[in-house]
Amino acid sequence: MAMKKLLIASLLFSSATVYGAEGFVVKDIHFEGLQRVAVGAALLSMPVRTGDTVNDEDISNTIRALFATGNFEDVRVLRDGDTLLVQVKERPTIASITFSGNKSVKDDMLKQNLEASGVRVGESLDRTTLSDIEKGLEDFYYSVGKYSASVKAVVTPLPRNRVDLKLVFQEGVSAKIQQINIVGNHAFSTDELISHFQLRDEVPWWNVVGDRKYQKQKLAGDLETLRSYYLDRGYARFNIDSTQVSLTPDKKGIYITVNITEGDQYKLSGVQVSGNLAGHSAEIENLTKIEPGELYNGTKVTKMEDDIKKLLGRYGYAYPRVQSQPEINDADKTVKLRVNVDAGNRFYVRKIRFEGNDTSKDSVLRREMRQMEGAWLGSDLVDQGKERLNRLGYFETVDTDTQRVPGSPDQVDVVYKVKERNTGSFNFGIGYGTESGVSFQAGVQQDNWLGTGYSVGINGTKNDYQTYTELSVTNPYFTVDGVSLGGRIFYNDFQADDADLSDYTNKSYGTDVTLGFPINEYNTLRAGLGYVHNSLSNMQPQVAMWRYLNSMGEYPSNTNDRNSFSANDFTFNYGWTYNKLDRGFFPTEGTRVNLNGKVTIPGSDNEYYKATLDTATYVPIDDDHKWVVLGRTRWGYGDGIGGKEMPFYENFYAGGSSTVRGFQSNTIGPKAVYYPASSRHDGDDDYDNDCKSTETAPCKSDDAVGGNAMAVASLEFITPTPFISDKYANSVRTSFFWDVGTVWDTNWDSNAYAGYPDYSDPSNIRMSAGIALQWMSPLGPLVFSYAQPFKKYDGDKSEQFQFNIGKTW
């Protein structure tokens, strides 16, 4: 830049010596050296026109104006009689921009920074900016601890006054922190203070947060952490006097020294609130109560200010000002806090708008709102609307923006900005195990049908042992009050033997309808009726099955028709859901509890009840919610009524991707104990299980029969997915898990079957551990898991790798 100013000054001086002070009339203007710039464009940028009388000052202004266009590296103005001769050298045009050696900074980010400086392909190159760009990039590397980094701009001339611009990076290595010293600390040890830092001079293997690589930004954050640590413990006079960062001669090591003055501890003597409290003085004073002798705490003071703002925000005061001023009494070591509040104007909502909902209708979003148009602005109501939209599961992100109405002193518009996700899914599941081989299922689900909020699903399974189809429809707003109505019809042809379960065939069909009643923001009750017809055949004589048939008045001597049996049941279905998750898909905080149950009603062939309870709790362990602990449980229990047993085909099962991963689906728990062939009365002694027809005593097999009780739990640690940018953080999730579970039969008579496993024992717990990856793909959620069972029992079947599309728990 200094060179350009010097060049301009020299040209101005030379012009003055040529033209003199008297001036002359310009009859014509000629240009030399124009290539890319049109003559007309150059003339328009000049203050001189043909016919003007020009002097030295006019020539100086002309040169200055031509340089200001940014198109020229050199400008000379000469006189040829009455003609003004303008000689220019155009700046070269950038033909290409390339990067070499940059690993820490991506090409896209570099291009954005260059464009912000006016450096882009097709534009002219201002060489004077290159040194600033080089220095700016090197400063960035220095800020992240790479002090040996260098950046050089290489300009290669090309034909037709074009150049190739190449930025060559030598990033070097990150300087590592050799030692962090804190000088002046007496109340707390240096190790205690540094343990709260992100930067460390020593990092144990288990610490995934600490880092020895120096970064200027992290140091600033650590200094603020240090300040907060003292202020939160009563050291109101704490001060960071200075910070020194020293570099070793080889630029690979960093020494950090922080000089502090701790001061004394101070206690709060009182809080005085003043200002415009908008009639809410009592509520505000409740927020400022302190315990006698309480130490001064900076974080609590900040929280108190935020709580006052939130309180006023609930009453429409959208922009309150709250300032706390501590009055320190050094004599008695106390602090009196003076809080000044200015509630400002109360604001009313003119309009609620939605942006980004290209598929979902406005009415679908608007019915989730708790903030009303025309009412005063309630920050809590706006937040509730955001929570409800997130829990719908239709959107990847939901953001709110409160915009003041131009020209109005007390009106705002509330804008909800959503990014829709694909709510339709093609469900396809594949599992592979050493014993099970390959299994799969398929279906289609649309949770936001045509943007109406209706959930419509067609699901089915077709494989060697099952043909299942189901059509379901749910209207979440059957009434304006939010009462939902859902229904389904289904058909199932199930060959249990081919699924490694006990031997029987069940052809069933049915329907049910359910109403959901919202109790409050987080609780919903459900009630409905259902009908199902079950037609059983090919029943091999095993203990649990025969026990059920006996309770129904069906005995082996009466089952000569290939052991067939049918039942028609009418059920009362009920449920309860508590949902306080922060969003519908990939939640990071909150709890969800879901209870589902049914009981047969008069007119049914069976008499039983059955219920399941699912819970899930997400606990973030960092402020950004990238590291989350997830705990899940599933409980199930059912039994007969009036001396009857719950049907064996209603039993609970465990194992598979939705319960205990690493085990083949439905294989955990009690196994079939078959009666010997001589006890059968169907004339067929051909067994399709592990038992032989020559057996004379009940035979234990590996065929799972399930049980009337189930308990499953999972502890999951959700982590950021490696090599995935923040752009896709809401679409991909990685976790490490530990699953446990068991299924048992409370009606199993261990005395009658001594020598066989006690299937009534709930302590036969299976365990597995592994890693899972979930991806919200265009086809629906993809779930990959690899688990290794490390506690299993005889007859359990493992399935280490499991892959599902459209199935999550």
UniProtKB/Swiss-Prot annotation:
Signal peptide: 1-20
Domain of life: Bacteria
Record-level GO cellular component terms: Bam protein complex
Keywords: Cell outer membrane, Membrane, Repeat, Signal, Transmembrane, Transmembrane beta strand
Primary residence: membrane
Subcellular location: Cell outer membrane
Domain POTRA, first and last residues per copy: 24-91, 92-172, 175-263, 266-344, 347-421
Biological process terms in GO annotation: Gram-negative-bacterium-type cell outer membrane assembly; protein insertion into membrane
PANTHER family, A to Z: OUTER MEMBRANE PROTEIN ASSEMBLY FACTOR BAMA, SORTING AND ASSEMBLY MACHINERY SAMM50 PROTEIN FAMILY MEMBER
Family note: Belongs to the BamA family.
Protein name per the record: Outer membrane protein assembly factor BamA
Native source organism of the sequence: Citrobacter koseri (strain ATCC BAA-895 / CDC 4225-83 / SGSC4696)
Gene: bamA
